[in-house]
Amino acid sequence: MNKQEFYVLIERDEDGIYIGEVPQLKACYSQGETIDELMQNIREVIELCLEEIELESTSEFIGIQKVVV
């Protein structure tokens, strides 16, 4: 199986838990008490997400922009 590359957006909530989201895969989220734990968990979630969808339905991650209002 070919390796695929995904980006993970990481935030920390008010309780100090790290939350990760994969923008290329809809509804692909996980969390962990450390970034290492989050990354291990998100790998498992990505594998599950890929089993549920066809590769053509993934979107291409373009980037992140900051907006000041």
From Swiss-Prot:
One Pfam family named in its UniProt record: HicB_lk_antitox
Q: Output the InterPro entries linked to this UniProt entry.
A: HicB-like, TA_system_antitoxin, TTHA1013/TTHA0281-like
Single GO biological process annotation from the record: regulation of DNA-templated transcription
* SUPFAM superfamilies attached to this UniProt entry: TTHA1013/TTHA0281-like
* Superkingdom: Bacteria
The text of the family note is: Belongs to the UPF0150 family.
Looking up PANTHER family in the UniProt record yields: ANTITOXIN HICB
Can you say what this protein is called? UPF0150 protein ssr1258
